[in-house]
């Protein structure tokens, strides 16, 4: 039986600032060009869900704080503060301010919340740190913060919020893994972090990346702007993904002599983009944009060090009119996603992205009409699940929690299945936000995945 939101009570203790366990350098570190995006206060929050440990004598809050303190010796910039420099760019002041850490106690068992597998956003928001002190215009939130919530069953959640310009998903995962290794008894993390931001400094350019659409050509939805935005989590099982890919191959074989393979990301990205556009009832002649993050660590020349934990992403982009998106064979749209992803991996594209952000980060903004842009992020392969074990059991689930980065109607995240639902092995969870009035149509589109004829 689902737990009633009105009955959920969370008692919070005093906030503490966890500092490195040993002295660390006191310096100001500049960020890379890829971290100069025009959203320096965007936070990347996730909730890790753990069942009751077999050794009930261990206090997870104590263990996590001790391990965090040790990890910050290696990741000491994360114990500092983001500040704006005189040149307008953001840097990290390594002032040993510490990482905000909040311990809380919930009045229910995790099983009553279905281990967050239903992903009630109202609950998830209560499990991450909501720390917004008064700041002047030249200062930003802490690079990272934690909230550990204990439940009556002995299980607990770890809410980790990370500044999106300091760490991308891969970087945040490396940091979390270091904490886990130290919590489980290791004397040091296996992978030593490196700063290496100087590898990603660009040249001033007068030819920024072209804008794929502007506000005069962007599609519009009759449902936007909206005050009532919903967040839903859709489960796409392995069989539905197989049927989708088979149907795409069938389309190609009917129209081309040469077959082509598509990844799960490429196939689902195209399908979800089209489904969302239909749900929003975008106007036919307006343009709609799919933009997705592309991780380029191994595509640099030479590749970035394994210990690099900063932001190292470019963005793939596909733009079509709503009429084209709605009427083209889905396989054609998937090909465009694949081609855009491959372009984003190239050295020329990476350099142009870096140069544009170095010259004028504001040029990187994408103009959009209400609902015209879908921002897609793939979290399936970050490495948070399932081998993140504090010496107890591995996490049973990991979910995003909305904040200033997520509270708009143009977001979609692909997630790995939770360990709570064995039937979803090999599947994908699709997290999306839409106006409430558009969600029924999107649900209908997602249900259609189950009956696609290969």
UniProtKB/Swiss-Prot annotation:
Disrupting the production of quinolizidine type antinutritional alkaloids (QAs) by selecting inactive tetrahydroanabasine acetyltransferase variants is a potential kick-start for the domestication of novel legume crops. It holds the Pfam family Transferase. InterPro entries: CAT-like_dom_sf, Plant_acyltransferase. PANTHER family: ACYL TRANSFERASE 4, HXXXD-TYPE ACYL-TRANSFERASE FAMILY PROTEIN. Belongs to the plant acyltransferase family. Monomer. This is Inactive tetrahydroanabasine acetyltransferase pauper allele. The lineage of its organism: Eukaryota, Viridiplantae, Streptophyta, Embryophyta, Tracheophyta.
